[in-house]
Swiss-Prot record:
GO terms for biological process: regulation of blood pressure; response to hypoxia. It is found in: Endoplasmic reticulum membrane; Golgi apparatus membrane; Cytoplasmic vesicle membrane. Appears to be a negative regulator of type-1 angiotensin II receptor-mediated signaling by regulating receptor internalization as well as mechanism of receptor desensitization such as phosphorylation. May play a role of negative regulator in cardiomyocyte hypertrophy induced by angiotensin II through an inhibition of p38 mitogen-activated protein kinase pathway. Attenuates type-1 angiotensin II receptor growth promoting effect and angiotensin II-induced phosphorylation of protein kinase AKT and of STAT3. Signal peptide: none annotated. The modification Phosphothreonine is found at T135. One of its GO terms (molecular function) is angiotensin type II receptor activity. Keywords: Cytoplasmic vesicle, Endoplasmic reticulum, Golgi apparatus, Membrane, Phosphoprotein, Transmembrane, Transmembrane helix. It comes from the Eukaryota. Residues 31-53, 108-160 are cytoplasmic. Residues 1-9, 75-86 are extracellular. It comes from Rattus norvegicus. This is Type-1 angiotensin II receptor-associated protein.
Length: 160
């Protein structure tokens, strides 16, 4: 299944609008958390080739999913009293429901920019992949790199 091609600016605009409406009743840490992540999204729009920017935005979206669940569950009963409170809570919940889909789209953009997940199979141990680089403790290199100079009659530099 192919993900739809959605512009990052559209994702930011939708979440900014829903966060603004959510801040009518929820303030404080809800606003700081969500607007900080939206600022990371603006950074990702400004630097189109940056894997770090889109990766930070993706990580922030995932973090705000959990933070929004906690924040809404704690303060929902005291906020959703009047019509404005119910509207604001509804927009915050709608934003929360859209965030996993937004994470999938942003992850697709992250992969297009050349990013990888930091949790790979070699996270807990050494990688089994072989690359063109030699490791420092590789047995392919000679034990004494200056031995070849001594065999040719050249003076080897002395260490201090």
């Amino acid at each position: 299944m192919e993900l739809p091609a959605v512009n990052l600016k559209v994702i930011l605009l939708v979440h900014w609008l829903l966060t603004t409406w959510g801040c009518l009743a929820f303030s404080g840490s809800y606003a700081w958390g969500n607007f900080t992540i939206l600022a990371l999204g603006v950074w990702a729009v400004a630097q189109r080739d940056s894997v770090d920017a889109i990766g930070m935005f993706l990580g922030g979206l995932v973090a705000t999913i959990f933070l929004d669940i906690i924040y809404i569950s704690i303060f929902y009963s005291s906020v959703a009293v009047g019509d404005t409170g119910r509207f604001s809570a509804g927009m915050a919940i709608f934003s929360l429901l859209l965030k996993p889909f937004s994470c999938c789209l942003v992850y697709h953009m992250h992969r297009e920019r050349g990013g990888e997940l930091p949790l790979r199979s070699d996270f807990f141990g050494p990688s089994q992949e072989h690359s063109a680089y030699q490791t420092i403790d590789s047995s392919d290199s000679p034990a004494d790199p200056l031995a070849s100079l001594e065999n040719k009659g050249q003076a080897a530099p002395r260490g201090y």
